[in-house]
Design a protein with these regions (language model features):
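Short-chain dehydrogenase/reductase
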Residues: 9, 13, 58-67, 101, ...
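Conserved catalytic Lys-bearing alpha helix of Rossmann-like short-chain dehydrogenase/reductases
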Residues: 13-19, 65-73, 107, 140
Length: 279
């Protein structure tokens, strides 16, 4: 997500343009385009499966190029197409297996440090934050396979979703639990402001040097600045049409809490910095 504009254009827009040209050349029956919820940008409110032009907040190269790549497919008239916008894809729900580190994984080293530094009986607080749509890769594969073969769906866009999503606060709470870290209580922004108001004003500078601390954490763990936008993610995705179709095939996204342990264990054993350096 932190790559520069040129690299993103070449990979996302240029790659899609070449793939469409190939599909036309071989006279493919249908072009199946894997887009992303990023095509909606940072739209404030509910973004449906039928919305596209309404996307806003496309300043980031990743959002911009995902949107522009999908636009190429939508304008295509020489071949039939279907578009899939999965959420934030993580590892296999049973094994935790994953081949890359991005999205929530950026924050795993920091969560591990907190878990190692603080006792499990300690109770901490965190704001609830925005809702994130996280999906395990095996669910995405099963969902796309079913949707690709569903009759009469050409020209449609699908959200293979976690129908409930998970707030940033609950995501951190579940990951801390998987890492055997401190227990986390989730509060809304108003409650946190009320709590901070009880701290003597003279002590605030020593309590929350937030900007400096946040910058140090991001630099230490290589967290891209753009990844912080997930903390207050403003978009809710309506996946009513997709969920109705998937229900016919008995396909349903498991809640993140049910497979967080597998995701965490696989990361520690295979994707953590020291695990990768030892390969």
């Amino acid at each position: 997500i932190g790559a520069d504009m040129q690299a993103q254009v070449e990979a996302n827009v240029g790659g899609t343009r070449h793939a469409l040209a190939c599909a036309r050349a071989i006279e493919a029956g249908c072009f199946h385009h894997v887009s992303s919820i990023a095509a909606a940008g940072l739209y404030k409110g509910t973004f449906t499966e039928d919305m596209f032009e309404e996307a806003t907040g496309l300043d980031n190269p990743y959002y911009r190029t995902k949107h522009d790549a999908e636009a190429l497919v939508r304008r295509e008239t020489g071949i039939r197409w279907r578009i899939y916008r999965p959420g934030v894809v993580v590892g296999h729900s049973a094994t935790g297996e994953m081949d890359k580190v991005d999205g929530p994984y950026y924050f795993f080293p920091a969560i591990r440090q907190v878990s190692n530094a603080l006792p499990g009986w300690l109770r901490a607080i965190m704001v609830q934050g925005g809702s994130i749509n996280i999906v395990p890769v095996d669910f995405v594969v099963d969902a796309m396979d079913y949707l690709m073969h569903a009759r009469g769906q050409d020209g449609q866009t699908f959200f293979p979703p976690d129908p409930k999503g998970i707030t940033t606060g609950d995501l951190v709470r579940v990951l801390l639990q998987a890492a055997h870290g401190p227990k986390l209580s989730i509060v809304n922004g108003g409650a946190l402001e009320k709590l901070l108001a009880q701290v003597p004003v003279g002590r605030l500078p020593g309590v929350v040097p937030l900007t400096r601390a946040l910058g140090a954490v991001m630099e230490k763990y290589g967290i891209p600045e753009e990844a912080l936008k997930f903390v207050g993610y403003p978009t809710r995705f309506d996946s009513t049409k997709t969920r109705k179709l998937l229900a016919r095939g008995g396909i349903e996204c498991p809640p993140f809490e049910s497979y967080a342990g597998a995701i965490w264990t696989y990361w520690e054993e295979h994707l953590a910095p020291e695990a990768r350096s030892g390969r």
